[in-house]
Amino acid sequence: MCATDNAPAANAAPEKPSNVGVEVGHTGEQTNPYGANPADFLSNVSKFQLIESTLREGEQFASAFFDTETKIEIAKALDDFGVDYIELTSPAASEQSRSDCEAICKLGLKAKILTHIRCHMDDARLAVSTGVDGVDVVIGTSQFLRQYSHGKDMNYIAQSAVEVIEFVKSHGIEIRFSSEDSFRSDLVDLLNIYRTVDKIGVNRVGIADTVGCANPRQVYELVRTLKSVVSCDIECHFHNDTGCAIANAYTALEAGANLIDVSVLGIGERNGITSLGGLMARMIAADRDYVLSKYKLHKLRDLENLVADAVQVNIPFNNPITGFCAFTHKAGIHAKAILANPSTYEILNPADFGLTRYIHFANRLTGWNAIKSRVDQLNLHLTDAQCKDVTAKIKKLGDVRSLNIDDVDSIIREFHADVTSTPTVAATEGPAVEDEPAAKKAKTEE
């Protein structure tokens, strides 16, 4: 794609890189030698499901306020994208939350609708009355939460869990039981409560890294251990306080978890949870065919823009997939390789997401291969040697100031005009060669 004529300077900010780049085609199939080990029979990297929590966890984001119309718009967009479950705020949170839950349940979406409640019978009764497809029950199990939050011991937690689970099951809908603050809970307590709820028939149990303290190794060990204790599915919820949410989610799937909680842009309490787009990037690198068959990835940018507008934030420049430079290549060495085969410096194919890649050539780091590509786009003809010469001019100006695409195009066109207007003299045409004695005489007279 040719860059626009009214492009800003190359260092101007956060606009789509289409203003400063060259689109190039994708050649060759993406391959990843570091994908999931096919011999690992416990891995669910190629058969995971998403519980999308923008309308529950995302409502806990500091600047979030979703009115009913916005919630419905987001729910429809998530459903169109292809998420398996949509999780909603507890109807016990407020009267409007209950009304919104009922409204979304009536939309007839393909995704199953869940609501997230405390492990309490009052909440359970209210939840099943809204028409949801499932209920996600949670209660804190760490010493911190047992002492400073709800004040209950593990016996009380187990009894409450059994009562709520049996009630929800009696209404014929799905039920998940999750511990809160799982990674700071006593392992014996944790496994005992999971074993108890598994025996009475929960659809899945949940592990929650509520404070974002877990690392991938801890996640792998806990999920593997839990896998040997329960027969139901395992769902995982990871906060991003220490930057491990995406890595932890992927590791959980490798260890045998079945479902991951995500939100658009990762919005949620504090700095949020595993982001939908970030996890899509990680998963498509592991199993492209599965992800492409399941999710409408070309809808991701619009989905993120919708939520970003709703919570009044900008999409981060380094956001996986949709960050404004996610598929922009600047260094000359990179550009040369990308022009030959995009897989040299890309593990993701932008076309899978309805996006394009760009070669950012308006800078002093550019290489002559990138400039030659731009020359071709301008329908001009320069030899390789001439492309190298004009690249040197561009680099020289780039050492003085920031460049934009108009600067580069102007240099290229002026250079092209100069070389095409200068008569080309054949070496075999003797009369056109300057007379050597006369030339020496002229220099002597100077």
UniProtKB/Swiss-Prot annotation:
Residues 437-446 have a biased composition (Basic and acidic residues). This is Homocitrate synthase, mitochondrial. Its EC number is 2.3.3.14. GO terms for molecular function: homocitrate synthase activity; metal ion binding. The keyword Metal-binding applies. HAMAP family: Homocitr_synth_fung_arch. Residues 48-307 form the Pyruvate carboxyltransferase domain. The keyword Transferase applies. The active site is at 334 (proton acceptor). Mg(2+) binds at residues 57, 237, 239. InterPro entries: 2-IPM_HCS-like, AIPM/Hcit_synth_CS, Aldolase_TIM, DRE_TIM_HCS_fun_bact, Homocitrate_synth, LeuA/HCS_post-cat, PYR_CT. Its main location: mitochondrion. Belongs to the alpha-IPM synthase/homocitrate synthase family. Homocitrate synthase LYS20/LYS21 subfamily. It is found in: Mitochondrion. One of its GO terms (cellular component) is mitochondrion. Keywords: Amino-acid biosynthesis, Lysine biosynthesis, Magnesium, Manganese, Metal-binding, Mitochondrion, Transferase, Transit peptide. Pathway: Amino-acid biosynthesis; L-lysine biosynthesis via AAA pathway; L-alpha-aminoadipate from 2-oxoglutarate: step 1/5. It comes from Yarrowia lipolytica (strain CLIB 122 / E 150) (Yeast).
